[in-house]
Amino acid sequence: MPSTVFTALLCLFSPKKGTGFFISTYNKNFYNGKTMPNLVLPTRTLYVVNKAIDLFHHRGFHLIGVDRIVKESEITKATFYNYFHSKERLIEICLMVQKEKLQEQVVAMVEYDLSTPTIDKLKKLYDLHTDLEGLYYLLFKAIFEIKNSYPKAYQTAMRYRTWLKMKFTVSLEC
């Protein structure tokens, strides 16, 4: 039974061939092929990012433009472009924020919860990734909506899937 659940999760989260990109630790970000330190955002920027995450989550990436984000965040367009430079960069940052939060939850479930049986951990992981109001939904939505229009941001979503697959592989080897 556990192998069936695991196989189902791997099928669900496996990237297509040729898109594999392994990350050695869960908290590293990559931008233009270079390693970046952990994402640290000022308070006002974080407010804009959280507002954009909410808008993208409920309306989609293509229906929400810079004008709507600026209006909802109550900042000027100049401030927006000073913070993010482009909508693609904002989407990429939003996905990085969601990815890091999700990775923290997965690591907490898998590595630190030693009293829970493996099958229950898999069920929790499944529930975490199928919750439409959860952290994974934006990453999942990005896979289908932004592949052609925002390829750098798309790679962020794909790196999470690759990380999750690697995490399962390492967990099985132990």
Task: Please annotate each region the language model reported.
Residues 51-58, 105-109:
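Solvent-exposed, amphipathic alpha-helical segments
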